[in-house]
Every structure is written in structure tokens, then in C-alpha cells.
């Protein structure tokens, strides 16, 4: 990756594999924005992953619970914590790397109008055997206390309507341009120019 900012659509990616790829890239100096974090997948059935998260929720400082560890419920923060664990975040280099990273639920402006990419080596369909169980991160987050799944879903529905309208307009415009260029190439002027060797 060697673009100013790369926007990754996290839908149907495996959490750990995507996190490792992003960690490597931000350490190399690449700015990355991750959208649709709630649509990430984790291998394994929902109930087992929920038990693992509840095991994590029990971990706390013995004498003062406010000192951490902090149990983030939002999908964006769960992904952030996975990436942070793969970066030496206490050094200046690690802090600078994490500042190059932004993670969002849904696709907020202005990233709804930017080109989004996927990470093939982290896609569930290419990495998980067909028929194996997997968990959606948004569902897991909601089960442990994340309150904004419905809000994000509502905003995503609105965005998809706008996106469909834009795509329909773009297709119509492309069709007009191609038909006009085809008509122009078949015109008498083009034939005359061809006769003169142009």
C-alpha cells in the first residue's frame, strides 16, 4: 500500500487477520481508515466467543477496578485493542503508528464517497472452511453492552439508498457517453478523416 489514505471496508473480514495486516501497515507509515467494524467476523460459534469475552470482563485490578484493564464494548474499540496488542504502543514509534489509524462503525462522511478496498488474506470466504461457524462482531458487542447497533443500522440503510441513487445516475451517464462516442465514430466526418489517413 502506498496511497495517502487507504479506506478498508471491514465487512466479512476475520478480526485477527485484518488486525495483523493493519498493524504492519501503520508501522510502515501508511494512514488507514477502517469502516463497518461492526460487520467483522470472528471464527467460532457465537456462544463460545461470548464466553471468552465474559472471561475478559472478569479481569480487573484487584484493589481498584478503575485502574483497568478497560473492557471496551464497541466493535471499533475491540478492533483497535487487537491492533494495539500487535504494536509496541508504549514507544514513540508505536504511538505515531496508532495515530495513523481511524476505525468507525458504519461508513460516516466523508468516507462514504471514497473508494473502499478489502484485504484478501483476511477475508472469511477465503480463509475459513465452508460450513465452519463464525460470529459477527456487532452481535457480540451488543450482547456485552454496546447500545448503538440499531442506530448504526438505520444510518447504513440511509447511506445505501443514497449510494444506489448515485450508482443509477452514474450508469445512465456512462451509457449516454458511450452511445454518443459510438455515434461520433460512425459519423461522416470520421469517415472523411479516415480517408485522409487520420
UniProtKB/Swiss-Prot annotation:
**Entry-annotated residues carrying Phosphoserine:** 43, 181, 185, 187
Which coarse location class describes where this protein primarily resides? cytoplasm
Mind telling me which Gene3D superfamilies this protein's record contains?
Answer: 1.20.5.4280, Ribosomal protein L13
GO biological process: any one?
A: cytoplasmic translation
State the Gene Ontology terms under molecular function: mRNA binding; RNA binding; structural constituent of ribosome
Q: At which residues is the cross-link Glycyl lysine isopeptide (Lys-Gly) (interchain with G-Cter in ubiquitin) found?
A: 176
Q: Which superkingdom does the taxonomy of this entry point to?
A: Eukaryota
Instruction: Name the Pfam families on file.
Output: Ribosomal_L13 (PF00572)
Record keywords, A-Z: Acetylation, Cytoplasm, Isopeptide bond, Phosphoprotein, Ribonucleoprotein, Ribosomal protein, Ubl conjugation
Q: Where in the cell is it found?
A: Cytoplasm
Answer whether the UniProt record assigns the keyword Phosphoprotein to this protein.
yes
- UniProt-listed InterPro entries: Ribosomal_uL13, Ribosomal_uL13_CS, Ribosomal_uL13_euk/arc, Ribosomal_uL13_sf
Q: Where does the record place the modification N-acetylserine?
A: 2
State what this protein does.
Answer: Component of the ribosome, a large ribonucleoprotein complex responsible for the synthesis of proteins in the cell. The small ribosomal subunit (SSU) binds messenger RNAs (mRNAs) and translates the encoded message by selecting cognate aminoacyl-transfer RNA (tRNA) molecules. The large subunit (LSU) contains the ribosomal catalytic site termed the peptidyl transferase center (PTC), which catalyzes the formation of peptide bonds, thereby polymerizing the amino acids delivered by tRNAs into a polypeptide chain.
Misc. comment:
There are 2 genes for uL13 in yeast.
Q: Which PANTHER family match?
A: LARGE RIBOSOMAL SUBUNIT PROTEIN UL13, RIBOSOMAL PROTEIN L13
* Known partners and oligomeric status: Component of the large ribosomal subunit (LSU). Mature yeast ribosomes consist of a small (40S) and a large (60S) subunit. The 40S small subunit contains 1 molecule of ribosomal RNA (18S rRNA) and 33 different proteins (encoded by 57 genes). The large 60S subunit contains 3 rRNA molecules (25S, 5.8S and 5S rRNA) and 46 different proteins (encoded by 81 genes).
- UniProt record similarity statement: Belongs to the universal ribosomal protein uL13 family.
Name of the protein: Large ribosomal subunit protein uL13B
What's the source species for this entry? Saccharomyces cerevisiae (strain ATCC 204508 / S288c) (Baker's yeast)
**Gene label:** RPL16B
